[in-house]
Regions:
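Short hydrophobic/aromatic patches at helix-to-coil boundaries
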Residues: 30, 104-108
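Sequence/structural segment immediately N-terminal to covalent heme-attachment motifs in c-type
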Residues: 26-43
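Domain-level signature for proteins that mediate thiol-based redox and metal-cofactor handling
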Residues: 23, 38, 66-67
Length: 108
């Protein structure tokens, strides 16, 4: 089998090399899954806790929302979304909490 020179092999090679690269949104979803956020939350529907898109809508005009939510991720909270409290997640680092908070706020 011979390869003709008119085939787009460089483009194909590039596409194949990018196939294994995760998008930032997928990476942040993986982080949320690994930190057990998805046990109580979903992106687009209420589970035990509110949907991430609802959280994003609620805090869309809050300039300090990323830090506020990062603190809630680590320390927990109650009373904002009803009677069920969010437990503390002390195993989540501050950097990961901020990354998760920024991702949650980016959901639509």
């Amino acid at each position: 089998m011979s390869l003709s020179t008119n085939r787009p092999l460089p483009a194909l090679a590039l596409l194949l090399s990018l196939a294994g690269v995760a998008t930032p949104a997928a990476a942040d979803l993986a982080l949320a899954t690994s930190k057990n956020c998805m046990s109580c939350h979903a992106v687009d529907r209420k589970v035990l806790g509110p949907a991430f898109k609802d959280i994003a809508a609620k805090y869309k005009d809050n300039k300090g929302a990323t830090d506020l939510l990062a603190t809630k991720i680590i320390k927990g909270g109650a009373g904002v979304w009803g009677p069920v409290p969010m437990p503390a997640n002390t195993q989540v680092s501050e950097a990961d909490a901020k990354k998760l908070a920024a991702w949650v706020l980016s959901t639509k």
